């Protein structure tokens, strides 16, 4: 029996609701999708609750579920995924934080939580931090630049804990917060003290940086602090190959998603031009996915643009992103061939009028190049998906892919 290779395509934040400016249609309904339309002739269609009905997923928890790991068991926080995606090599027990370069005044009151967002000097500022802050109280400190204003911070040492609060006040006009232990463990108190000492040292280094002097002269906000949030302790996850038998690879430019995939032991590729935003090079990502299919059983193509447009409330950009995803799938089929299983869905809904994640179910399409009984739907969108046969959660996806690629093993005798 032929074993088909698998293309898993996730449009981040794909799901939506009726949009007033589209006369009650959704972005998926409004988008031109010729490739997807051609695949419907041999596809199962339906709705997926990434975690469960009504549960609002994060991108981290939803991707864990989609790859077959129950987030209620395996999710330990976002920080370590972000750090792995930014290039960190973590060992069991390391504590990782998400961070933002930000601007504060001399009283450490936040003026700009992202220091202008696009910081050309970010890589050099991270290098300066790594050169000048190598340890605090015997604990090794490492900084990693993600994208734009994003920074990951990793602590390595003994008696550390992730049970500490953020220093990020999450609002402009408020002073940065002292990190506090969130339980009674001595390791938590120690870690909070280290974080507070580290924050003071970061401010000292960045406030005296010539790179920030240059930014001020140019009328730009200085990136003179790193706001920390989302502490997580690194624990090893099961590897995709071990629990599915699938050799997996991923194409993504988003640090969080790259980190999740690295945690699962997947090869991760970010081609030139892939940005993790609406300006990404879709065709470069599609070409990379097609090439990876030559050597892997499953290739995951992640597109962040749909979510970015949704958070900005830009419906036309979300429609365009969906149309470019359609073209990307077509490019993979042109380059690799159509004898593969294709699953297209979102990791969660981000309605453009809401501008936030929601607990709405997400439409899902599963193309199988064999004689299945397809669902009789006229288009792929939220409305038509309600007529399809699939009503699943994220944890069902891997089993569906294994079954329809002829790789599943019997459950029982």
Swiss-Prot record:
Q: What family is this?
A: Belongs to the BPG-independent phosphoglycerate mutase family. A-PGAM subfamily.
Known CDD domains for this protein? iPGM_like (cd16011)
Reaction(s) catalysed by this chain, per the record, are: (2R)-2-phosphoglycerate = (2R)-3-phosphoglycerate
List the pathway annotation: Carbohydrate degradation; glycolysis; pyruvate from D-glyceraldehyde 3-phosphate: step 3/5
Alphabetized InterPro entries for the sequence: Alkaline_phosphatase_core_sf, ApgAM_prokaryotes, Metalloenzyme, Pglycerate_mutase_ApgM
Identify the EC number(s): 5.4.2.12
> Which biological process terms from the Gene Ontology are attached to this UniProt entry?
glycolytic process
Residue ranges annotated as transmembrane are none
Q: Identify a single GO molecular function assigned to this protein.
A: phosphoglycerate mutase activity
Keywords of the record, alphabetical order, are: Glycolysis, Isomerase
Put simply, this protein is called 2,3-bisphosphoglycerate-independent phosphoglycerate mutase
Which species is listed as the source? Metallosphaera sedula (strain ATCC 51363 / DSM 5348 / JCM 9185 / NBRC 15509 / TH2)
Function as written in the Swiss-Prot or TrEMBL entry:
Catalyzes the interconversion of 2-phosphoglycerate and 3-phosphoglycerate.
Give the EC class as a word: isomerase
PANTHER family in the record, alphabetically? COFACTOR-INDEPENDENT PHOSPHOGLYCERATE MUTASE (PTHR31209), METALLOENZYME DOMAIN-CONTAINING PROTEIN (PTHR31209:SF0)
